[in-house]
Regions:
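Short acidic, hydrophobic short linear motifs in intrinsically disordered regions
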Residues: 107-118
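A generic structural signal for residues located within well-ordered alpha-helices
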Residues: 89-92, 125, 185-186
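Short, locally clustered residues in the helix-turn-helix/winged-helix DNA-binding domain
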Residues: 99-103, 119, 195
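Interdomain motor-coupling "hinge/lid" segment immediately C-terminal to the ATP-binding subdomain
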Residues: 3-108
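Short hinge/gating elements
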Residues: 80-84, 116-121, 170-180
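A cross-kingdom feature that marks ATP-driven nucleic-acid transaction machinery
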Residues: 129-234
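Short, basic interhelical loop/turn and adjoining N-cap
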Residues: 120-129
Length: 234
């Protein structure tokens, strides 16, 4: 049963909590149970690559074994929580939208831009269908939508949002691992960590560009820029 359906049946009689996959700290605690923790930078690289699904860190699995487990989780979610529940017939269309969003973690895009791209490669899907698929992927907790916040106008913008994955291993289990994707996956990791800590997270739009994340929790506001390395001439 989806969370929205639970709300319908149990109005006023339940409290919902969003459960995330393992944080980096939790990942290290799991790993200490069966092996020696390596250099922290190497561990972070492994965490980005292997993700934080608890089932993949109960013992020392190979990368291929991890991705097999995660792919099973992905397939179960796609086919049970999305395809079957919503009676989707054109599964190939849904999977193309999934692959596009997974490949474009950290990039701003819209349902229209996805539709335009798929049309350019001879797989036309209308905007409304793409938008519907994105909503269903959100409701199944595979994707998190991150809106843009105009820091000057102090308002949420409704265009060019970003989407982040519930876990970085989802991306690699579906698309395969490539080193050039690490920067955007690191951004995904930071986004999830801010959410775990109870922040409402948006992308900060400025006249000259953007701040990766504006994180708000009551009166506490953080401005976060994510980078793999900081180069300095000092």
């Amino acid at each position: 049963m989806m969370s929205s359906e639970i709300a319908t049946y149990l109005t006023g009689r339940y409290v919902s909590f969003r459960i995330y996959t393992l944080s980096f700290q939790e990942y290290l605690e799991f790993k200490k149970q069966y092996t020696q923790v390596k250099d922290i930078h190497a561990e972070l690289a492994d965490y980005i690559r292997l993700g934080g699904f608890p089932a993949t860190h109960l013992r020392e699995y190979s990368q291929d074994e991890v991705y097999t487990i995660v792919r099973d989780i992905y397939n179960s979610t796609i086919f049970s929580d999305i395809v079957k529940r919503n009676q989707i017939r054109k599964i190939d269309q849904l999977e193309r939208v999934v692959r596009y969003t997974f490949a474009n973690v950290g990039n701003s895009f819209s349902a229209k831009s996805i539709s335009n791209y798929l049309k350019s490669v001879n797989h036309a899907i209308d905007n409304e269908t793409v938008y519907s698929y994105l909503e269903k992927l959100e409701k199944a907790y595979l994707l998190h939508r991150c809106s843009r916040y105009d820091l000057r106008g102090k308002e949420i913008l409704k265009t060019q949002e970003k989407f982040y994955l519930a876990d970085t291993a989802l991306r690699y289990s579906v698309l395969g691992y490539t080193p050039d994707s690490v920067a955007s996956s690191l951004e995904n990791v930071v986004y999830l960590e801010l959410c775990r800590r109870g922040y409402t997270v948006t992308i900060g739009k400025t006249p000259d560009g953007e701040v990766d994340f504006v994180a708000q929790k009551q009166n506490d506001r953080l401005y976060v820029q994510v980078t793999q390395e900081i180069k300095s001439d000092i």
